[in-house]
């Protein structure tokens, strides 16, 4: 990832470092408009996800997470910026005339070829079932349900590791540190997701954050008692309770939010590291 550092010509450009990947203006059947609504509200108009709203209009790029063009080689034509995710995407032209977007694997360049299938080479960008991937291989875009498409390790710089195989399942170490059992028939893509330096970005000003559709975060102690359990008091007062709470009065910071009895508890061999 190329980071563009701004000169300190104004206060808003001081320490500003943004992604310099070129923004294309594609027009094909893989791109369509989307109606974004809600602004973090539910059907009743109540805020359920805070600090959301506004932002620039976006066109959605349809990404091929299934990689079901089996045994047909494709060539990387472009590497593009996607406003809907922090990873880059690649436009692939397959030999049969099909065009699809995929997540950009780290190290992939324009002109490289990729392929999907069961007996394809273990090469960066190729997709194949876990049963045909050697142990210790770095993978991403991992399926959980066969045929549904990749759902795990899709963020920028994300990478998982295939650590063992036993019976019909394979143990995969996910980016969070969780070790999970996945069917060996599920597919995954070899390599790491590109744009690994995304955490080095510094927007530098509040307006750039608003372009992304993220609104300001207000501390609970700065609110009134009617708005937050931490609110109220004379002057700069503490939260006024033993433990912090959410705006709805539930315990916060350190409380487990995962359901105690979930259908896939037996598939998780080790919980994620905090």
Curated annotation (Swiss-Prot):
Residues 1-33, 223-265 are annotated as: Disordered. One of its GO terms (molecular function) is structural constituent of ribosome. GO terms for biological process: mitochondrial translation. GO terms for cellular component: chloroplast; mitochondrial large ribosomal subunit. It is found in: Plastid, Chloroplast. Gene3D superfamilies: 2.30.30.30, Nucleic acid-binding proteins, Ribosomal protein L2, domain 3. SUPFAM superfamilies: Nucleic acid-binding proteins, Translation proteins SH3-like domain. The keyword Chloroplast applies. PROSITE patterns: RIBOSOMAL_L2. InterPro entries: NA-bd_OB-fold (IPR012340), Rib_uL2_dom2 (IPR014722), Ribosomal_uL2 (IPR002171), Ribosomal_uL2_bac/org-type (IPR005880), Ribosomal_uL2_C (IPR022669), Ribosomal_uL2_CS (IPR022671), Ribosomal_uL2_dom3 (IPR014726), Ribosomal_uL2_RNA-bd_dom (IPR022666). Keywords: Chloroplast, Plastid, Ribonucleoprotein, Ribosomal protein. Part of the 50S ribosomal subunit. Belongs to the universal ribosomal protein uL2 family. This is Large ribosomal subunit protein uL2cz/uL2cy. It comes from Pelargonium hortorum (Common geranium).
